[in-house]
Amino acid sequence: MYPSSNAMPRRSGWTLAGAAFALSLSASTAFAGCSGTGALAIGGPGGVTPFLPFASGGAISSLIAAINTSNTAFLTQSTAFVSAPANPAPGQEGGGVWARAIGGEITTKNTTTTSNVQALGVPVPGTITCDNENKLSFAGAQVGTDIASLNVSGWNFHVGSTVGYLAAKSRDVSSVGPLNPLGGTFTDELQVPFVGLYAAATKDGFFIDGQIRRDFYQNSLNDPLVSGLFNQKLDARGLAFSGNIGYNIPLQNNWFIEPSAGVVVSKVKVDPLNVSGSGLAAFLAGGFGTFPGQLRISDINSTLARLSVRGGTTIASGSMIWQPFVTLSVYHEFQGAITSSFDGVAVTNFTGVGGLPSGLVSTSNIGTYGQIGLGVSGQIAGTGLLGYLRGDYREGENLRGYSLNGGIRYQFTPDLVAPRPMYAKAPILKAPAAFVQAYNWTGFFIGGSLGVLNGQLDMDYLAPPIAAGLTANPRFAGALGGFQAGYDYQTGKWVFGVEANINATNARGAKPCQVFILVTCEDKKDWIGTATARAGYAFWNRSIVYGRAGAAFTNTTITATCNGNGVIPIGCPATDSQSRVGWTVGFGSEFALSPNWTVRGETNYYDLGKNQYNLQQIAPAPTFVVDVREKGFISTVGLNYRFTPGVVVAKY
């Protein structure tokens, strides 16, 4: 390992049900692989191209395709799955909980151009152009909760939080070409947990919404024969804003048409990727080994705009209300090519060996594509239960694919709902007063939560002397789910309580270790728990906002992994695991859906202080002593069952 010291979206969610018609769709044909010009046109032993780890473009284009698809999979479905009762009283409280799932496959095409190549410090004339094709399969789920103020001068206002998780696998399926005789060889398996806040407003047929979201990309890259990647970990982080606006126009005989527009603006930052090169593995396979180096991908920016028209009808059948629909959309990506660079500077700084290949890489973006969606939404009349199911097909010059997604929502409904879709706006006229009960929060509760865990380790090397003073800061993120139990006591508007919870998680993270260019510092945890007190205030009849503080505890494992699959360098792996205890503080809100059931969303910050880890390498390599500080966030959406709910007073 190391050298030794000796060396519906939107307001209601029915747009979540349709999407897109393909305008000017191109035929789907396989791309033709890689070719070069000038000195870079020469493959085999007489040329420099076989020694450039990213010249084929497959690794970069696959990574960009994976991040781009993950970045837009849920965002383009609109903001969140929100709705309101059809006939709310003026100023009525509202709230609900929802969940949706999505799965599908997308194939993207792009052109990668490698230029400005140098080898042994000498410019190499020419370029390498690769027509890359990547196939990405994905599946994910998202949950959210919101509270609302309904019929405020005819407006409905919703504010909520959401968490989710997307798993995907990207495969380079590019065709064989003169400079890539093996065709596509790169794969990327990734998980993308995310957290977000959303808001929506509706009035009559008008709706507008927005969401801000934080994404955490945990990649596992594999391309042993071309790039020298052996399931190597790579982290990236994204911030995205999405917005939608539209108008629902009622037609005769329960038909409707709904034009809308939306935009997703996002930025993803990718950590540097140090690669060991395919060297030994490629030579053993009879090929030509690539050199080690570092890949730096610039920020991946996206500005994806959408224009849609949705049409359908409403059908009442017994206790069900159905709304079949079709949606036609066109999407356009306004951002241009993504730029990257690779060189051997980091290797040279550590080993003193210079002249390693370097170059610039430009990868085209997805452009314009169309989408058609078919679906149906439904509501059980007289209840707060509603849902939808939809399928989408999309195609464009550089993209084609399909997805299937569906969702369900339950919301607080104080009176019987009129026989019309729950995708309702506030009425123009004053509604009759609804029978609303003020909630009593006193009593025991148990429940479950789903969410996201993310954070960072700050590593300070103490020994051996060769490493003292060096640092590394790997981040981590993953899905989280578990159980909580506690007790609340209400006095007046104030609510005080205690709670303990325990959650399983698949949180992982990685970043290049500073002690050696070809080593990655990885961290993981399998569970985390908290024990806290909380204090809240019931601003309204059925909802509270609260703060909480107490203890956090977990077990964190740190592993130093050799990028060269254990061949180079020696000493790998080095691992240590520590149980840790620290403090946590957070805030959240909770809403009473029924006399016994409540839903909540909350975020907690935790800090576990410093612990000392001893990363013992395989002898004769030395043990590395590292001070590690851990801090992070726990964001969840939870559902609680309360054993002793009560009605304080009935209000009319």
Show where each model-derived region lies.
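Substrate-binding cleft of carbohydrate-active enzyme catalytic domains
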Residues: 222
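Secretion/assembly modules of Gram-negative surface proteins
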Residues: 2-209, 216-218, 229-542, 554-555, ...
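Glycine-aromatic-enriched beta-strand/loop faces of beta-sandwich-type recognition domains
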Residues: 563-567
